Swiss-Prot record:
Organism: Homo sapiens (Human)
InterPro entries per the UniProt record, alphabetical: LZ3wCH, Mnd1, Mnd1_HTH, WH_DNA-bd_sf
Protein name according to UniProt: Meiotic nuclear division protein 1 homolog
Disulfide bonds: none
Transmembrane segments: none
Keywords (A to Z) from UniProt: Acetylation, Coiled coil, DNA recombination, DNA-binding, Meiosis, Nucleus
Phylogenetic placement of the source organism: Eukaryota, Metazoa, Chordata, Craniata, Vertebrata
Gene, per the UniProt record: MND1
Subunit structure: Heterodimer with PSMC3IP/HOP2. MND1-PSMC3IP interacts with DMC1 and RAD51 and binds preferentially to dsDNA.
Amino acid sequence: MSKKKGLSAEEKRTRMMEIFSETKDVFQLKDLEKIAPKEKGITAMSVKEVLQSLVDDGMVDCERIGTSNYYWAFPSKALHARKHKLEVLESQLSEGSQKHASLQKSIEKAKIGRCETEERTRLAKELSSLRDQREQLKAEVEKYKDCDPQVVEEIRQANKVAKEAANRWTDNIFAIKSWAKRKFGFEENKIDRTFGIPEDFDYID
């Protein structure tokens, strides 16, 4: 029997994002090291590396509170990342179109001469390559433009759930601060500094 093929890096990233999109919750690393192997087949050893790659690419948010890192990726972030990617692709397509027009003019000038020059041959090859690149960019732009109204509505609903989840965390943090003040007599600003809580920390409207 052949050995079962492991997941590729991209498959791991996709499955990790599924955890966030399906649960719409906030996790610590230790939580994901338990959930990912069981539900998505991602080995516990690779969870941290996969998470970091998603954080580096702006797909997942990470915030340190006290001594722990918390990870989340609400649907609105994915939408913003998609919008940014589309803007980059459209910019590349525009630049490619301008270069295409410039090369076409150069080739027309080269055709005026009677002989097939090396310059004309080089320009023709470059133009052909540019056409291929432009077609690829067009296809990718169309892919990112395709946005189902149902998906938009799902994102709106997910944002609502995400806001409620964030406010539940805010409730918990305020409760812990209140308990610490009563139990140990700590001043509120000392608690904020100790646990890295910003001064403007509050509920999301």
